[in-house]
């Protein structure tokens, strides 16, 4: 057909020769005829002498050929891959020796989801150029923000040295606020692909994820991505990997996930490097729940990693944590779409539906087993403790039940979030939620709105402080001499507190050398203490700082990116509690305290925060019949004050002359009336004012 096209268009012998070579090459590599026609016709239609178009066409042809070769997953001398039905039959009989469980870990925006797309295309799990990029990023918030916030799983098949292998792939988030997703995913893995951007090199979350993998003693496959970009520097990045992690540069794979270059070598290296799972198929069934989500028709769906034995449909399973028994209604494997299978065996990952209607019954990290069988807990995953807390209230109290249901379903899908009941005289009944960071909080609330139609009011984030009590009565009430508090309204009186402690984090910052001075100034401004500073190479520095958590949860990351022109990266981990000097900042309106507006701040920041709050309240509180004095106080000391003038009624407007004593009498009566009003009147603060002050 191609020769027919060439004769029809009467083009030069050179083009016909190129087409013939292309056809021969494609047929040798089993590329489908549609690809042959696409490449050849574009070449035949090229105008003679158009060198620019010719260069583009050659590059495009190479790209299409590489990606098509990856998609077909066929090399010379191998047979065609089996159909989907054949693969699912193979799934049931796949020996443990030919199973590999691995995750892709990297810093944010290093190309994890794009590489996952190429791997899915290469193994035939999805169609090439299916019209959707980042297939595993299926949440609306992920597509809007361009980041991965939820780890996703896909089971793929790949032929290696004549044998078919089952690879369970997990694409993980790269932002530090979603490190719980990475930790949860690694509980079901035996190895990781450590992906590094060949342009930006090793960044903060790369370091954190690498150490997390090594703590679990997982095999590491180092891969450099984006080698097709003009300013990529793979040699220097390989040296950085050697300096920081001791990785041999010769072991680092170089790929372009965008073009598909070198992607097949990644799968080959995974099969050769990552060990098969250490499981037992001849023992009693035991599995770890490492993810779950809610389906309105099937209830809670649980993603399980089978540690021992085998699970079949219609068997009865029991939760080790709740002791409740369920019947398995369906078993599926994610490819990444759900594909029903009759059973799952040790070493495999499966999705089970067991009519679990209460979202609280599904616990990530729980162990499940067959009914009336005694097994030990898996114990390989523990949720991280939240660092940032915020109040969540319904905009309308009539929607309290609906918001509660939405939060329960979201927490099922995000086990890092903690929920406690809270109330506020200004905002009504609500909850106090714990998150791993500010972005985690923003994404959670955005998902509440998009996926459940909720309209929550989110208060300003805070952290948990630890107090050592000196009051015997309070110690007896608490049952111990310490008290953890994240709500400033519950802050005890200073005379009842012996010591204050605030949470710290160990932050890792990687920045270009020209911005080191600005970064140090920012850290000092946020009360940071430098722990170490290492030159990665001639252009970048890795610094470690101990910082108060309260100083970084709001705008630290934004400030860091701004002063470094976007080149610095930052990640952090919990560093315990440290003694500090904290005070409770109270807001008074005409001498009366307003508990809903109080805050806990460090003594060095108290004056600045006080000034900001009184200025904001002056703008938000409307004028009233009496003058309003807004004061920010620590104890009895006033740190800042603003005044809202009262409405003025011109009581002398009706006078048109006469004795001046009449005018003075009216003004005196007005002054006495205002004085009396100040003594007995309550300041009316609109509900919207509280919302605007309290919300982030």
From Swiss-Prot:
This is Translation factor waclaw, mitochondrial. The keyword Membrane applies. It is an enzyme of class 3 (hydrolase). It is a peripheral membrane protein. Promotes mitochondrial protein synthesis. May act as a fidelity factor of the translation reaction, by catalyzing a one-codon backward translocation of tRNAs on improperly translocated ribosomes. Binds to mitochondrial ribosomes in a GTP-dependent manner. One of its GO terms (cellular component) is mitochondrial inner membrane. Its EC number is 3.6.5.-. It catalyses: GTP + H2O = GDP + phosphate + H(+). The keyword Cell division does not apply. GTP binds at residues 106-113, 171-175, 225-228. One of its GO terms (molecular function) is GTP binding. It comes from Drosophila melanogaster. One of its GO terms (biological process) is positive regulation of translation. Residues 1-76 form a transit peptide. SUPFAM superfamilies: EF-G C-terminal domain-like, P-loop containing nucleoside triphosphate hydrolases. PROSITE patterns: G_TR_1, G_TR_2. Belongs to the TRAFAC class translation factor GTPase superfamily. Classic translation factor GTPase family. LepA subfamily. Gene3D superfamilies: 3.30.70.240, Elongation factor 4, C-terminal domain (3.30.70.2570), Elongation Factor G (Translational Gtpase), domain 3 (3.30.70.870), P-loop containing nucleotide triphosphate hydrolases (3.40.50.300), Translation factors (2.40.30.10). Keywords: GTP-binding, Hydrolase, Membrane, Mitochondrion, Mitochondrion inner membrane, Nucleotide-binding, Protein biosynthesis, Transit peptide. It is found in: Mitochondrion inner membrane. Residues 97-278 form the tr-type G domain. It comes from the Eukaryota. Pfam families: EFG_C, GTP_EFTU, LepA_C.
């Amino acid at each position: 057909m191609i020769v027919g096209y060439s004769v029809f268009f009467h083009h030069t012998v050179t083009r016909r020769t190129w087409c013939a070579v292309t056809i021969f090459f494609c047929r040798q590599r089993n590329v489908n005829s549609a690809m042959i026609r696409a490449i050849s016709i574009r070449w035949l239609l090229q105008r003679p002498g158009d060198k620019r178009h010719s260069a583009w066409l050659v590059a495009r042809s190479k790209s299409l050929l590489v990606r098509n070769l990856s998609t077909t997953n066929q090399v010379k001398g191998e047979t065609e891959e089996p159909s989907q039905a054949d693969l699912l039959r193979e799934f049931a009989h796949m020996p443990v020796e030919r199973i590999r469980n691995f995750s892709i870990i990297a810093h944010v925006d290093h190309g994890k989801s794009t590489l996952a797309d190429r791997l899915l295309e290469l193994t035939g799990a999805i169609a090439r150029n299916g019209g959707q990029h980042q297939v595993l990023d299926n949440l609306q918030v992920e597509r809007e923000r361009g980041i991965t916030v939820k780890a996703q799983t896909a089971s793929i098949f790949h032929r290696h040295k004549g044998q078919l292998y089952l690879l369970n792939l997990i694409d993980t988030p790269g932002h530090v606020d979603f490190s719980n997703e990475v930790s949860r995913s690694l509980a079901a893995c035996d190895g990781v692909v450590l992906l590094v951007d060949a342009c930006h090199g090793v960044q903060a979350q790369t370091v954190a994820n690498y150490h997390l993998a090594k703590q679990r003693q997982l095999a590491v496959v180092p891969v450099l991505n984006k080698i097709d970009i003009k300013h990529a520097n793979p040699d220097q990045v390989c040296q950085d990997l050697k300096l920081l992690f001791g990785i041999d540069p010769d072991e680092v794979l170089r790929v372009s996930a965008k073009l598909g270059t070198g992607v097949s070598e990644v799968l080959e290296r995974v099969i050769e490097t990552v060990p098969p799972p250490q499981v037992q198929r001849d023992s009693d069934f035991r599995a770890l729940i490492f993810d779950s989500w809610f389906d309105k028709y099937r209830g809670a769906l649980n993603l399980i990693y089978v540690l021992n034995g085998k699970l079949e449909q219609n068997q009865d399973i029991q939760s080790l944590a709740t002791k409740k028994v369920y019947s398995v209604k369906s078993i599926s494997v994610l490819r990444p779409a759900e594909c029903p299978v009759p059973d799952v065996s040790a070493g495999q990952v499966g999705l089970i539906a067991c009519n679990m209607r209460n979202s609280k019954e599904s616990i990530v990290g729980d162990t499940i087993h067959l009914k009336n069988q005694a097994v030990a807990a898996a114990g390989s995953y523990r949720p991280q403790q939240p660092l940032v807390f915020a109040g969540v209230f319904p905009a309308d109290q009539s929607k309290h039940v609906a918001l509660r249901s939405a939060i329960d379903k979201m927490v099922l899908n995000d086990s890092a979030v903690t929920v406690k009941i809270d109330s506020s005289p200004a905002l009504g009944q609500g909850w106090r939620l714990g998150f791993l960071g500010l972005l985690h909080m923003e994404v959670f609330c955005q998902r509440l709105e998009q996926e459940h139609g909720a309209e929550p009011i989110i208060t300003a984030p805070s952290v948990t402080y630890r107090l050592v009590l000196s009051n015997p009565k309070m110690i007896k009430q608490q049952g111990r001499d310490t008290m953890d508090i994240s709500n400033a309204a519950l802050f005890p009186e200073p005379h009842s507190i012996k010591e204050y402690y605030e949470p710290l984090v160990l932050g890792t910052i990687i920045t270009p050398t020209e911005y080191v001075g600005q970064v140090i100034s920012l850290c000092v401004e946020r009360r940071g203490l430098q722990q170490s500073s290492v030159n990665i190479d001639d252009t970048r520095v890795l610094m470690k700082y101990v910082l108060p958590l309260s100083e970084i949860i709001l705008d630290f990351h934004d400030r860091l990116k701004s002063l470094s022109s976007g080149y610095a990266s930052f990640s952090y981990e919990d560093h315990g509690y440290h003694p500090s000097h904290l005070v409770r900042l109270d807001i008074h309106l005409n001498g009366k305290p307003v508990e809903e507006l109080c805050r806990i701040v460090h003594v060095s920041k108290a004056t600045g925060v006080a000034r900001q709050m009184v200025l904001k309240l002056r703008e938000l509180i409307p004028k009233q019949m009496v003058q309003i004095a807004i004061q920010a106080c620590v104890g009895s000391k006033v740190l800042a004050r603003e005044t809202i003038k009262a409405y003025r009624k011109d009581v002398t407007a009706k006078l048109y002359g006469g004795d001046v004593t009449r005018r003075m009498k009216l003004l005196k009566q007005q002054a006495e009336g205002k004085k009396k009003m100040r003594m007995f009147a309550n300041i009316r603060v609109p509900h919207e004012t509280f919302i605007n002050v309290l919300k982030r």
